[in-house]
Amino acid sequence: MRDIPSHAGVDPHRRRLLTHLGAATLLPLLGRAGSSDATTPPLRPTRSPLLPPEHALRLPYATPASDAQLLREGLPIGNGRLGALCGGAPACETLFVSEGSLWSGGSNAVLQDDGQFAYTKEEFGSFMLLAKLFVELEGHAQAQVSDYQRELDMSNGCVRVRYRIGNTRYTRTLFASHPDAAIVLRLDCEGAGSHRGRIRLVDTHAGAGRADGRAGLRFAGQLDNGLRYAAALRVHSDGGRLETGDGLLQFHDCRGLTIVLCGDTDYAADGARGWRDATRDPLALARNRAQAAATVPAALLLDTHVADHRALFDTLQVELGQSSDAQRGLETWQRIQARAATPALPDPELEVAYLQFGRYLTIAASRDGLPTNLQGLWLENNDPPWMSDYHSDVNLQMNYWLADPSGLGACVDALTRYCLAQLPSWTRITQTHFNDPRNRFRNTSGKIAGWTVAISTNPFGGNGWYWHPAGNAWLCDSLWQHYEFTQDRDDLTRIYPLLKGACEFWQARLIAMEVTDADGSTRQCLVDDHDWSPEHGPENARGIAYAQELVWTLFGQYRQASALLGRDAAYAATIATLQQCLYLPEISPLSGQLQEWMSPTDLGEAHHRHLSPLMGLFPGHRLHPDLAPPAQLEAARKLLEARGMQSFGWACAWRALCWARLGDAERAYALVLTNLKPSIGHSNGTAPNLFDIYDLSQHGDPTLGGVFQIDANFGTPAAMLEMLLYSRPGQITLLPALPKAWAAQGRVTGLGARGGFTVDMAWRNGVPTQVSVRSVGGTRTRLSWGAQAHDITLARGQVLRVL
């Protein structure tokens, strides 16, 4: 069985998807389904869109996950609001269930004695588990089971468990439906057997749930911050008998069971309403959704989910070469370990699966709810590392580096909505608290305007840990780059207030400083006030490379937005003048590296995880080989070399992206493989379920272990795509950093390019053999590879076959 198929990129079923569903069916699913307040039932597909197993991209496993290791071994499902980790044990299916808005904490607007924000679970708050669901099956002990299989079917967006007891074949299918706003678990059997057991629904904050009629369970509660939450479960049985009592739902002699779980909170993304919707009854919503979905045949629930999922997942197809039959015959964890062995053959289909897993997580975690946090949408308990927050100094941004290049631009809207909803609170807190005399990062001019954030943010307008002056510019950059891919003026109009407010902050913050150049001449420059280069070095340095690069980029983006929208021309001219006066990082005469600080003697930690001074290389373009002076480019390369090739997952992903930008394919590829290596014990690397593991003991405390942090699951696939295509508005470069392992032959369709284009291409022996470009909003660009260059002009929707 080719669980990670060699022909994953050539899918005839993808081309027939619209035919199966009917365009009139598919498009309403994308437009309305899964809305948290939707009362109209989702439209249902008229034909099954389920991709057959031989064409689906699957991650197979030969054993169930243990409850104690569910975060490393459990398989994730999600619909953007509800997420679950699924264990797959025959005797007890365990689900750890989360709801994206279930957060403790609040605005956290009182500064500490040092002028910074409290950063504890009690004050800042934390992302929390909603429930644990246990489906216990009598007579299904592991010792009685044969032919056990468990898999994540990424193409169809579901988890399956299969096993045999005697002559009966048991199958489970689990998925989180966006159209039906529900988690669904379907149990089937073939043969003489049936299902007998009980269901427990546990509120992770207040204990067991209670019966809800003959075929349901439910609970409702309220966190200490007043946030109300609820979950409701409904069961439909094929034959047999259902009964409830003592907080349990028992089932007897059922040939099949459909279990539907829904959950909600009264969170509202509106600070003016106190981040609560007083009209919202989480229990009523959960019960109504569960009841509605439970009346729909399980196969139709699955078809509706698959249609919605595939409309996103199928936008990108990738082939990087063929793996061997022996590699295909391994289960996923064995395959990950085999790839890391010495010596080891390339396993390009495994690498494609890892890339597509990042896209699967994007679809599962980022739809119409809050954006992906440090753990995406998945938890094992109510005490996650760093409260599973929104870190603004690389992690939140990295969560979205994969989306637009991989055809999932629609998933970025969760980040846009989050920033827009938080903006009034961020602005108010900035203008009332940033210049507090206790804040060492305050504006020494005494001026204040616009908005910024702290390193950590929560969904209640709250900030945590240190102030992060340049965090506003980096968040704006993420939103601006989404516009670069889509060329959607409506999106640009939405983010314009964020761009302008960030510029206003920096207009008030920048200070004039006399700079002496290498030739002894002096000049006046504008520099960042006292600041901290994430996350090391002096905490009172001026003109840090990190902020200077981000502000230079922000000012350029705002000027373009102003011109495109025809707004605030006079203010844009002011920003242009400021941009021209900005100090930009220089080359240390001692190390030859790009300086992180204005002092040539301060090199900081040579191997530090952050690449803060290289913002102009990635995510920026100022230091790209096409644009940068050779001396600056070499200085950036030397700094990147000094940072090393070993770090945490997200830091290796960032390094890989930078090496791809520099055209060093083999170093970029080596870093991809570093992240793909198996996490043994607590080490950095990939867990059995492909989640990235972060070894906390490397922060100096050997008692700390490995934790899940999701950013590398997006950043590493983003680096893989960056190796295949580089783009900026007006320029698309094919195969800029193609490693030898992928050079023999490959294919990609639907690859996003800045400027408003998508690219399909195939290559052989490292050279493109087929190239097509489609406009999704762009009109002009230059397409190049090797010594070839083509100037392209297209109308929206037009496709040009270049080669």
Summary of predicted features, one role per range:
Residues 501, 505-561:
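Acidic/histidine-rich catalytic neighborhood
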Residues 345, 386-390, 403, 462-470, ...:
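Alpha-helix capping and helix-loop boundary segments enriched in small/acidic/polar residues
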Residues 41-463, 481-483, 500, 548, ...:
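Aromatic-residue-lined binding/catalytic grooves and analogous aromatic/hydrophobic interfacial grooves
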Residues 393-404, 468-480, 546-556, 610-621, ...:
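Well-ordered alpha-helical segments within folded domains of soluble proteins
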Residues 478-486, 490-491, 502-512, 572-604, ...:
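Non-catalytic carbohydrate-binding regions of carbohydrate-active enzymes
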Residues 1-13, 23-25:
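N-terminal secretory signal peptides
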Residues 369-377, 494, 511-528, 567-571, ...:
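Short, glycine/acidic-rich hinge or "gate" loops at secondary-structure transitions
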